[in-house]
Every structure is written in C-alpha cells, then in structure tokens.
C-alpha cells in the first residue's frame, strides 16, 4: 500500500524524506492537507489527514492541478507564466496557472473546465447537473450514449473515423468543434500564453489537433494578432506524482 511504499523510500533514501506530495481526484481542503471532497470514489478518504498517517509533512492536490504543476515545472508549460492545462480522458478536468502560480480559487476547485455548458438546450447533463457540458461532449464516459450505443470507447470512435465512416466523422468533428469553442472561450477570458492538452484522447494526434486548431482560429479573439499556443502535454501516467512533488516543494519553499 501507500504507507509501505513511503516507508520503503525512507529506508533506501540516503537522506530523510521531509515532505510528501499526494495527488488524487476530488478537491483538497484550504490548507492542502487532505481531500475534502471526493464524489463517488474511494469512500473513507475524505478528510483523512495523511500527514498523521505518514508521520511526514504531506500536501494534497487535485490530480488535474498536479498535472499542471508537472508541466509547469518540467514539461510543456516550463517558462510560461500564464497557462491552462486540460485533461481529456474519462472526463474533462484542468488547471490554471496565473502569474506563475497555480490558481485554486475559493474552494480549491478552479479548473474544472469540463463542467462548463456549451449547449444549454442539451437534455444530457453532467454529473453536476449542467446541461450540455464539455465533459459530456468529449469525455470517454459518455461516448456510448453519444453514439447511441455504437461505440464503447473514444478509441473505437477514432478507429472508425479513420475508415471514413460518415457517422464517426460527424461525431468526432462535432466533439472537437465543441472543444475548440471552449478553448477559444478560455483564451478570450484568460489570454494565456499556452494551453496544454493531456490524457488518453490526445493520443488521437493530428486527428485531434489539426481540426481543433481550425475551430480555434474561427472563434479566438486576436486583436493584436497574438496566438495562444496549443500543445500536447509531455507527461501522462506520471504527471500526478511529478506534479504533486513539485507542488509540495513549492509550498515548503514559500513557507520558509
């Protein structure tokens, strides 16, 4: 388990482990010491004080926020002050970097980009009850419903898209168009230097990024001709661990 892993690292490490960073789905509390809200997942871990469990100073961070920190410290966002990272997988999440700092907001929930509405007339709702959410339009969890049972995963959709299937092409491009509208809207509000996309859906490669850039060109406000970069994340599976460690280091340094 996690404690055994930490104790093993303490044993083999030449120096004492002074801080631990932990990423998880859900929302951290105001001091980033525990998971305050973890809907429908890992019951029993809400408000669990990890520092007492590990007997080591521990900082907890949302997994999408951790992915942002990983990219900001070591990856595609390194060197940028204002950026947005969006995770595209089972659902849609994200994180926001403002003036070089992770923006968490009032309830540590900033960046839940999937829960914006892009079609208020849509009967389908997100897990928060939001009609026409971006998460429903793009998330892997909804693909079976969006395709009327034809596709079990986004991977199947993309595979059929490559076979020039008309329905698959319409469904995929409609989803990408909605993502493009959303990204253009974020650009118009935040004016970031770069937006980084991560998660399994980005494995579509050019089938995602080429039409996405076309749609963003249609909707982004560019009064000075400056264009926000759209790039793929450098890290995938390890982004949570890397970002949580970076966040813990930043919190420790800022408290000195």
For each feature predicted by the language model, list its residue ranges.
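Short glycine-rich, Thr/Ser-proximal phosphate-binding strand/loop in the N-terminal lobe
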Residues: 1, 34-37, 107-109, 118
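Adenine-nucleotide phosphate-binding core of ATP-dependent small-molecule kinases
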Residues: 1-18, 131-137, 142-213, 228-240
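Glycine-rich phosphate-binding loop and adjoining helix at the ATP-binding site
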Residues: 3, 7, 15-20, 26-82, ...
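Short, hydrophobic alpha-helical segments
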Residues: 10, 248-256
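Short glycine-rich anion-binding loops that position phosphate/pyrophosphate groups of nucleotides
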Residues: 25-28, 89-91, 201
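Glycine/GP-enriched mid-protein hinge/lid loop-to-helix segment characteristic of carbohydrate kinases
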Residues: 59, 73-174
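Active-site glycine-centered loops adjacent to acidic/histidine catalytic or metal-binding residues
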Residues: 63, 89, 244
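Charged, glycine-enriched surface loops/patches
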Residues: 214-231, 242, 248
